[in-house]
Every structure is written in structure tokens, then in C-alpha cells.
Amino acid sequence: MSFRESDILITTAQELPGYKIVEVKGVVIGITVRSRGLGGNIAASFRSLIGGEIKEYVEMAEQARMQALERMIERAKALGANAVISVRFDSNELAQNMDEIIAYGTAVVVTKSI
């Protein structure tokens, strides 16, 4: 991922221990759409016959989530936020072989608690 951990705080919780929310900037969303290629589908189909983890899809899903998260973070930074709380992921199949992955949360400005 291209952002540094220190750039912005990210949490699935509704608050950040040790920090006070001083401003809510709003909902931020990052979206990516990925296509499952023919080669990956063939390999995955074969692997599903014999059982086990389908590594081609796991890798694609991990990359897609990271890209959606990165896009969400960039939108939060553009709003002037230094944290995103209540982060969630969602995914939908848009068409055969195409998946939409969404990362969303609430962009906020936080300060260290005393």
C-alpha cells in the first residue's frame, strides 16, 4: 500500500482510544471493480474440483480491498481528516466475472487526549 501508517489513523471502532474527535468531515468511500480473468477462472474451477483454497481469488480479493481502502483514505485526506472511524468493507457482483469492492467509513479530525 502506498500510504504510510502515520499519515492517517484507521479503525473499525467508533472511537480511537487516546484521541478526541473534534470534527466530523463526513462519509468517505473508496471503490474498485475487478474482473476475474479467464485464466484465473480456469485455475479456480480446477481447484474447486479437488477442494482447498482458491489462491488466485484470495490474492485478487486482498489487492482489491487494499485499493479500495487506499482510495477511501485519499478522499479522507482531501477533506482534511486525519482519521477514519467505523471502517467497513462491502462487495457486490456487478456482472458475471466482475466484482465491486467498497471501503467506507467516517472521516474525522482527532486530537490526542490529555
Swiss-Prot record:
Species per Swiss-Prot/TrEMBL record: Sulfurisphaera tokodaii (strain DSM 16993 / JCM 10545 / NBRC 100140 / 7)
Protein name: UPF0145 protein STK_10800
Record-annotated membrane-spanning stretches: none
Superkingdom as given in the UniProt entry: Archaea
Pfam families the record matches: YbjQ_1
Similarity comment text for this entry: Belongs to the UPF0145 family.
UniProt-listed PANTHER family: UPF0145 PROTEIN SCO3412, UPF0145 PROTEIN YBJQ
